[in-house]
């Protein structure tokens, strides 16, 4: 993007201008693209995420440092480190007022987006009404509603809204004057760009919109798709849109919740849809797992390649170092070899050491001689006359030539360009403090703490308010005194002292004798200096050779003895170490074996006790199970008899009821017939016939019914006696049996416990 900076008048601004904050200093000028806290104040300042918001906050904190330099009047003009001329103090004033929120504004957008998603997924959710602010189409947001085609070679005109074009007069620079003009600290400039802001935005601008109540446009369901994250749409996004449409169509076919008759159908449809969604999610998860697996394999492969590359670099570096060391060592050996060979050849040429006269003809005929190539180690330097071949240059050897050469040089050679030093970058690309800056800050804090501790003035001790007890010093030890002894003890002490002197003298004499014996060869070697004649010198030389041979033999013998002793000591040490190791391991093994044996004995004893207790409990349990089985059998028998009697009663009652119903039906039929006959006979009968009918009814119905009732009552009384007797027999037998079983079980348990204790005592005595 190209920028053209122009200075404009305030009354005519048809182009889009940007206000910048410019600070001028003596060394130069520094222009910042925005202010420190624009991310909190400016509503048009947008950060992409909470991470960028935090980074902007950190940068603002670093730019607007709250550390203040306060001069020290005592050491104001000092340059010493331990006497600084100023101190750093943390300013309590915060440039951001407390009512300004420092939180990221994107959380509100996320909340509204979550409400929109909830309204899309849940049709019963009522989205709260949003109060939109004035978009200010003709105000500050006017540039957002412009539309202009991108024509790079088209003449730049104002946007589709035509305003009166104001002609800007060209700016003419005033003539330079010797008087220095005042430079303002702030300056407002306008910046005209070749492109609109929308052309360089990472995320295309989305205009504000208002959603009608109870309507969910399909376009809003795709609000989560942003540029680079779903846009431009691919195969996956198209499938997602198709699934969303199918789900909305399926939701439209669902029965209403108010229809209770279709509730089961709605539940089945929802379960089926949920199974389909879960199956789709499982497929997506499997795809993601496969993709992650491939990515992991690729990362592992790259890591292995990088590791191999690093290893190869290390190996190559090590190989190159060893190769350089080898070459250097070989070169040194080669130089030493050449020098030694040269010396040997020189010595071999003149073995007898005779002096030879120089052959000048031979020297001048041999071009490898020192006449043509003298050796510098012998003090000859053939390049002493090299100044004779130096080229004399006019421009380098004369002042006039240097002046002429300097006049042809460009200005920046003689007049160096002064560039403002770049600000020290103390943050990384991610917005975090660098390690060096953090260490500088920590060192400054430590230095400040040390200075505070060093310059801390001790407060004068205040007089005590109350009386204090003075500690009493401990008494000194008594001075030792020497008691006078008797003459006999004094003589004994003097004799002991004399004996000690004799012993010390003898020890010193022995040490001198041993030293003389050790240095006897050196003494004899010193004595050889007094031999002046040839015979004596030869004798001394032979003695010296014999002595040196003896010394070498002695040293060799001592070396062999020391080697043998070292080997023997090593073998002895290893044997002792192995023996002590074996003995310590055997001791530990025996201790562990005894401890394990004790644990085994204790576990065996506990096992026997538990087995005895378990056998007693098992016998009691078996006895109780037998009793319960007998009780259960008796109860089952009683239940079977009760059920059989109950079923018999039910069957009899059912038969009686059935017979009664059938009899009643037949009686009703017969009654109808008899009634018809009776009516007919009634219409024909006489008084005697009426008396005969009454007597027949009494003898045929009333008397048999009374007899039947009496018979039933007798049967019921007889059965009641038998039932009471059966109940008494059953309950009396069961209670006596249960009591008897309990007493027998307690007696058996006591006898078993006594037997187990006796067995345990016998086992302990045997062990």
Curated annotation (Swiss-Prot):
UniProt keyword Mitochondrion, yes or no: yes
Post-translational modification: Phosphorylated by PKA.
Biased composition (Polar residues): 8-19
Keyword Cytoplasm: yes
Disulfide bonds: none
Residue segments, region Disordered: 1-29
One GO cellular component term: motile cilium
Location of the protein in the cell: Cytoplasm; Mitochondrion; Cytoplasm, Cytoskeleton, Cilium axoneme
A Gene Ontology BP annotation from the UniProt entry: cell differentiation
UniProt xrefs under Pfam families: CFAP91
Coiled-coil parts of chain: none
Location (main, coarse): cytoplasm
Keywords for the protein's UniProt record, in alphabetical order: Cell projection, Cytoplasm, Cytoskeleton, Differentiation, Mitochondrion, Spermatogenesis
Subunit structure: Part of a complex containing MYCBP, AKAP1 and PRKAR2B. Interacts with MYCBP and AKAP1. Interacts with CFAP61.
Stated family: Belongs to the CFAP91 family.
Protein's job: Involved in sperm flagellum axonemal organization and function. May regulate cilium motility through its role in the assembly of the axonemal radial spokes.
Protein name per Swiss-Prot or TrEMBL: Cilia- and flagella-associated protein 91
Taxonomic source organism: Macaca fascicularis
Gene: CFAP91
